[in-house]
């Protein structure tokens, strides 16, 4: 297998096309890229660049707030709010022995679910309202607009993924109804040059769910591990998102798609800002390899799991806020 030493670029402009030949080309690119490196830059995604710029502005404004102000909306049991530095550790990492917390802080929101939402009425894990800082004008509106736009884009991408996996797009979409979705506004302080190797902005890990769409600034620091175990830089490219697949999609695809390890090391000497959006299965989904992905040459590799319980375990392991909650 040839070594991949750069992140490929995929043009998804055809995702809105009815032209079968154009969709077929995109499907083939998805199959190849996410069966090998598992990361790509997306171009022609049709997300307004002004919306992305406004999102980063609101992120900057949030992280400039006094610590005491941000702590008014500290991360709660619904996994929403402010995550202070030194409170998140990738203890379950399969790719490094992680003992130190990530050197980042963030704001996180999820799908808004009020009292009359069916998920809240059923008592679904993490269902509930978001926490919002009241000090920043337009914060909620900007984040909600971006969140909604990214949700719609991921729904379209899921249709292409279903075709790539040989399964029915409508049936596959039902596994995300409604989806579990997260938007994080991350700030990574610069790590001094003499910092020990076990200190990361974000320790080596794979993502939990299905699709991650990352908007990042020009600072750099994101690295992706290729099949040979080498770390590849993923620098900023204007008007792109970096898309990677997570553990649930690797399971659904029976290993045909890879959930690739990645990390952040911010030795730039300046702050790094990034805004990842996570699109994951419905919290009650049962995730097991699709029949279309099980063959004589690719026998079943994974058992069925409950996504919500898997996510609960990961959050309890990785976040101080959840590790102090009742795990029974």
Question: What are the residue ranges of the model-derived segments?
Answer:
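Peripheral, non-catalytic segments flanking oxidoreductase cores
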Residues: 1-328
């Amino acid at each position: 297998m040839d070594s991949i030493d750069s992140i490929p670029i995929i043009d998804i402009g055809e995702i809105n096309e009815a032209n079968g030949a154009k969709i077929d080309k995109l499907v083939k690119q998805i199959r190849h890229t996410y069966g090998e490196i598992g990361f790509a830059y997306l171009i022609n995604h049709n997300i307004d660049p002004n919306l992305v710029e406004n999102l980063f502005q609101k992120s900057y404004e949030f992280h400039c707030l006094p610590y005491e102000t941000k702590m008014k909306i500290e991360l709660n049991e619904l996994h929403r709010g402010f995550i202070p530095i030194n409170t998140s550790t990738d203890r379950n990492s399969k790719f490094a022995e992680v003992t130190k917390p990530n050197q980042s802080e963030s704001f996180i929101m999820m799908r808004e679910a009020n009292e009359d939402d069916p998920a809240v009425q059923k008592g679904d894990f993490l269902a509930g309202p978001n926490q919002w800082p009241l000090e920043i004008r337009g914060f909620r509106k900007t984040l909600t607009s971006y969140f909604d736009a990214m949700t719609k884009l991921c729904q379209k991408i899921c249709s292409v993924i279903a075709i790539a996996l040989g399964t029915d797009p409508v049936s596959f979409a039902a596994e995300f109804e409604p989806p579990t979705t997260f938007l994080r506004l991350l700030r990574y302080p610069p790590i001094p040059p003499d910092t020990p190797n076990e200190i990361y902005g974000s320790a080596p890990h794979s993502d939990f769910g299905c699709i991650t769409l990352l908007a990042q600034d020009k600072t750099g620091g994101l690295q992706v591990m290729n099949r040979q175990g080498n770390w590849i830089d993923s620098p900023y490219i204007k008007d792109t998102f970096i898309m990677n697949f997570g553990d649930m999609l690797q399971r659904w695809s029976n290993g045909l798609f890879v959930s690739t390890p990645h990390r952040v090391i911010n030795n730039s000497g300046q702050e790094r800002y990034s805004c990842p959006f996570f699109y994951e299965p419905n919290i009650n989904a049962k995730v097991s390899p699709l029949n279309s992905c099980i063959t004589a040459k690719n026998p079943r590799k994974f058992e069925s799991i409950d996504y919500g319980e898997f996510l609960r375990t990961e959050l309890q392991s990785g976040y101080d806020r959840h590790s102090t909650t009742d795990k029974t």
